C-alpha cells in the first residue's frame, strides 16, 4: 500500500530536485525521507520562490513517485544531505488557493501549523487532486 506525502520546500530547491531526480527535505535531514517507500506519492508545496528570502508563492510545484532504492547521504562541499530518487511527472505550478476548498488537509482551522514539520502525510484524495491539477496544465 502506497503512502502519500507533502513536502514543504522552496520552489528553487524543488526545481533543483526535479532536475536531479531526487527528494531532499528539512535541510538534508534524514527523518522525512526515511518515512517514504518506493511507490509512495510525493507532492511539493512551496511557500516561497527561494529560501530564506524569496517572494511568497504558496503553490504546489512538483509531483512524483518515490523510486526504488534506499535513502543515501550525499557529500556536497561540507554539506551531507540525505536524498532519495524520485520519478517526477511533468507539471506546472498551481496555487494553493485554487485547490484549497477541495483539499482535506486544509479543512482544520490551524492546518498550516502541520507544514512546519517539512514532510506531512496526506490522503490519496489530496494527492490525486493536486497531481491532476498540476499535470493537466502541461503541454
Swiss-Prot record:
Pfam families: EVE. Transmembrane segments: none annotated. InterPro entries: EVE_domain, PUA-like_sf, UPF0310. Gene3D superfamilies: ph1033 like domains (3.10.590.10). SUPFAM superfamilies: PUA domain-like (SSF88697). Belongs to the UPF0310 family. This is UPF0310 protein RSal33209_2865. It comes from Renibacterium salmoninarum (strain ATCC 33209 / DSM 20767 / JCM 11484 / NBRC 15589 / NCIMB 2235).
Amino acid at each position: 500500500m502506497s503512502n502519500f506525502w507533502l513536502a514543504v520546500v522552496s520552489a528553487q530547491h524543488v526545481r533543483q530536485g526535479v532536475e536531479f531526480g531526487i527528494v531532499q527535505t528539512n535541510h538534508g535531514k534524514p527523518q522525512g525521507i526515511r518515512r517514504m517507500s518506493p511507490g509512495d506519492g510525493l507532492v511539493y508545496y512551496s511557500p516561497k520562490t527561494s529560501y530564506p528570502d524569496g517572494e511568497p508563492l504558496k503553490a504546489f510545484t512538483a509531483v512524483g513517485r518515490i523510486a526504488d532504492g534506499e535513502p543515501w547521504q550525499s557529500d556536497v562541499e561540507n554539506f551531507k544531505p540525505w536524498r532519495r530518487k524520485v520519478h517526477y511527472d511533468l507539471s506546472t505550478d498551481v496555487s494553493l488557493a485554487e485547490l484549497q476548498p477541495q483539499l482535506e488537509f486544509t479543512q482544520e482551522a490551524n492546518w498550516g501549523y502541520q507544514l512546519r514539520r517539512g514532510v506531512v502525510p496526506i490522503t490519496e484524495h489530496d494527492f490525486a487532486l493536486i497531481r491532476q491539477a498540476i499535470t493537466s496544465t502541461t503541454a
